[in-house]
Amino acid sequence: MLKELEVNGKRFFLAPESNFWAIGEREEVERFYRERKDALLEEMQRYRFEVDIRTAYINPTESCNRNCPYCYIPAEIRERGTKMSYEKLEEILTVLAENGVERVIFHGAEPLMVKDEIFRAMEDFDFKYGIQTNATLLEEEDAELLMKKGASVGISLDSPYKETNDYLRGKGHYDAVMRALDFFDGYRSLNIIMTVNKHNFQHLPAMVDFLAGKVSVMLANPVRGTSPGGRELRPPEGFEDYYIKAIDRAIENTKSGRRIVIGDFANILLGLVAPTSRVLQCDISPCGGGRRFFAVSADGIYPCGEFIGMEEFRANLSALSDWSSLIEKFEVVRKRTVEQIEECRNCEFRNLCGAPCPAEIYAESGTMLRKSPYCEFYKKLALKAMDVIARGDVRNVLKLERMKAIYRVEDF
């Protein structure tokens, strides 16, 4: 059944089960959709439920040289500080390669605490690599190696203002990131990750202006409530107004020649323009945890890094030797769908949002079957995506030249 919404003076028709949408007269849209519905539903079903692990997040150490108040990794684990030996890392990477994993992302705590091991691994194994770092331990030669390997690099920065950023991430962090931006000057696979919280949500538009011309992609992730500290720092109701202003600033910068995209929003927009092409796997249900990727830490394997510290979701590292049993272990996360959540099952945006994050919801309430604490935020972003479509700004967010058109409104 098509839902009708009015956005920016235009009537949108949306099929929530497939994310098909159109602007036009209901009778013509319904006829067009009926002719293609089965194929679109089949495609969405495959995208949502296919298990195909191609990415592994590896936390090679539990240690971090920072103590961010919203960290999703429990403090006792970071204090324990277990790290992988190179031999263990080598063993893990060998098994991943044998089972079809193509992309390895070194993740936090802080991966550069063991930079010698991960850089050696990058020389010894032929994966597509990524790293997420706070950049405080990054040296120029490290940046050169990462660029030589074509690695995607995500650097944390929470504000364009030094005082706020260092309040959240510790003294000296802002200056370290500024040095890193110089090291990576012009590198296309660099992005900045902002954790949006009650101390910095008002800085979102300024953050876009600050980063425009420095990076082409930034992520603006609302803080996860996986930890008590994260829940304490959630931004207040209405923070999405600043987020939407930031989206508009990104579009304005792009039009003026300084292209920058907020990746989280681009993924929502992609959920309408090309639903099964989405890269980020948080806003679909089941999410990508244990389905498209999993996380390997020094103490075990989890469907996603957000579950680290939750013993009931952990598999021993030895489970890598029995791949099919390991994948089966994470079925409990793959079974979690929006259709099981009372507030979500009839929502028109259920396959744009996915009710994230199951780890966050479980940590807070003991069940994964509740709506997202950011429900209203995702609804407003979905409507903003429709607004961007209605006003013809899609190409200022997504690179349409990289996509193949299958259906067009003009076909009616």
Curated annotation (Swiss-Prot):
Gene Ontology molecular function terms on file: 4 iron, 4 sulfur cluster binding; metal ion binding; oxidoreductase activity
Pfam families in alphabetical order: Radical_SAM
CDD domains from the UniProt entry: Radical_SAM, SPASM_CteB-like
Radical SAM core domain sequence ranges: 50-264
Residues noted as binding [4Fe-4S] cluster in the record, renumbered to the chain: 64, 68, 71
Superkingdom of origin organism: Archaea
Keywords carried by this UniProt record: 4Fe-4S, Iron, Iron-sulfur, Metal-binding, S-adenosyl-L-methionine
InterPro entries membership: 4Fe4S-binding_SPASM_dom (IPR023885), Aldolase_TIM (IPR013785), Elp3/MiaA/NifB-like_rSAM (IPR006638), rSAM (IPR007197), rSAM_cobopep (IPR026423), SPASM_CteB-like (IPR047602), Sulphatase_maturase_rSAM (IPR023867)
UniProt entry tagged with the keyword Ion transport: no
Cofactor entry: [4Fe-4S] cluster
Keyword hit for Iron: yes
Family to which the UniProt record says this protein belongs: Belongs to the radical SAM superfamily. Anaerobic sulfatase-maturating enzyme family.
Protein name: Uncharacterized protein AF_2204
